[in-house]
């Protein structure tokens, strides 16, 4: 007999499965719905010591969590070039390197290895900087607790932080094997597995409240050390992702190719006048037969739930850490925020 969780997963999958064509977009960890969903879960899990405005801002944080992928739009050439490396780190290209807590020192070390930094990526640095950006904004809030502009800024920055943290928790964002096992020249065969994994939070049904129950939320004494530890744990799951690939492809097989358009018929002799032709037979009414989607294997459901919980826990811990560390920030003497109009 199937475990009740497996039954729930299989039954709800028939309702929630999405067309495979939706996966034909550039790689972005967890997709739009997934990034927003896990960011909001992290905010809702925060303890009371985090300010009320922030705990009430889950929706806005989720909306902002999508922004970093918008910044990679192909029409924004300069912004795309700067933003794209912020979303990944191909760890194999820097094996054995001790990562400094400075993106430019890191870039210099990568260049010493005669590797293009754009191929490596700087995901841990985009996340570290996002944490520090939120920390400073929380420090502003401590000084100007009624300033709604600062509160809204904190929610936006929190969304960006959640995006980069979510990318780090997607194992294929940490590896040269990001879309199929890398070819000998380290290029990607682009097999489509990246899109399958990115869609898990969106396409696999699970009980979010149950998955995030008693979510562990830490205060990290050293954010940089914590980021590297989380990066290592995520990277260690790359092989597991590839072990799950057959199950994912069973759940979401490739969409069938559209039927070829028939060639126009060769003109024939003129038809007889309408009044000399017999009336056509009534057209048969086609019967629509819904093809049920294949079930989602329990192995994929379990992996999705584990990743969602780990990601929400990591994001919430970074939020709590940013709040705690903001207490030690001294705002510069030149900073004067205008008071809101009465």
For the regions a language model picked out, list residue spans one by one:
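Bacterial N-terminal signal peptides that target proteins for export
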Residues: 1-14
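Cleavable N-terminal signal peptides
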Residues: 16-17, 22, 27
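N-terminal, motif-rich segments that launch catalysis or mediate targeting to/interaction with membranes
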Residues: 26-160, 171-342
